[in-house]
Amino acid sequence: MSPLLRRLLLAALLQLAPAQAPVSQPDAPGHQRKVVSWIDVYTRATCQPREVVVPLTVELMGTVAKQLVPSCVTVQRCGGCCPDDGLECVPTGQHQVRMQILMIRYPSSQLGEMSLEEHSQCECRPKKKDSAVKPDRAATPHHRPQPRSVPGWDSAPGAPSPADITHPTPAPGPSAHAAPSTTSALTPGPAAAAADAAASSVAKGGA
């Protein structure tokens, strides 16, 4: 059999083999699939700098569009798993790398440089809580004046508080003296009592 005929026969067998083999067919004896060891799986998944794809999007103020070639680049960024859910993979060392990008602004084009950040060292650190990012409202001093309150006062909506009610101070003069009370005006003095007694005696003598 000629070498050319052997090649044609081998090519035909290779094309027919996948179609004839069932999907659930187990591996043939002696042909075991390669299994990645646990240590390799763990090492690949740890927090470390790894190559990631970063898209490049540029928006111009004008109406002329600028196209970047390539539209995305690959840089080293931190990523991977941490041993605890409360930890996250963060960069502890980074540097800037400059790349040449072809900028197309029709009908011309030119090479430009773009600076991107790359991570050189990574570490698993505790995740930042919301309280550490957002300021605590209780700790923030309020400059709004607080309304004055009097113990036992339960004011209705819109009613003034006793502490807010001011009483005018009387001006000095005759009007500043307190007027006699109703009780003192009705109580007779010594002269009035003597006159009443004399009138009573005269009335009795006439009778």
Curated annotation (Swiss-Prot):
Glycoprotein keyword on record: yes
GO cellular-component term (any): extracellular space
An example molecular function term from Gene Ontology annotations: chemoattractant activity
Disulfide bonds: C47-C89, C78-C122, C82-C124
UniProt entry keywords in alphabetical sequence: Disulfide bond, Glycoprotein, Growth factor, Heparin-binding, Mitogen, Secreted, Signal
Short name of one Pfam family: PDGF
InterPro entries: Cystine-knot_cytokine, PD_growth_factor_CS, PDGF/VEGF_dom, PDGF/VEGF_growth_factor
Signal peptide: 1-21
Top-rank taxon: Eukaryota
Compartment(s): Secreted
Region (Disordered): 122-207
Gene3D superfamilies, per database record: Cystine-knot cytokines
Mod. after translation: VEGF-B186 is O-glycosylated.
Residues passing through the membrane, by range: none
Tissue: Expressed in all tissues except liver. Highest levels found in heart, skeletal muscle and pancreas.
Function: Growth factor for endothelial cells. VEGF-B167 binds heparin and neuropilin-1 whereas the binding to neuropilin-1 of VEGF-B186 is regulated by proteolysis.
Subunit and interaction comment: Homodimer; disulfide-linked. Can also form heterodimer with VEGF.
Family assignment from sequence similarity: Belongs to the PDGF/VEGF growth factor family.
Protein name, UniProt field: Vascular endothelial growth factor B
The species this protein was found in: Homo sapiens
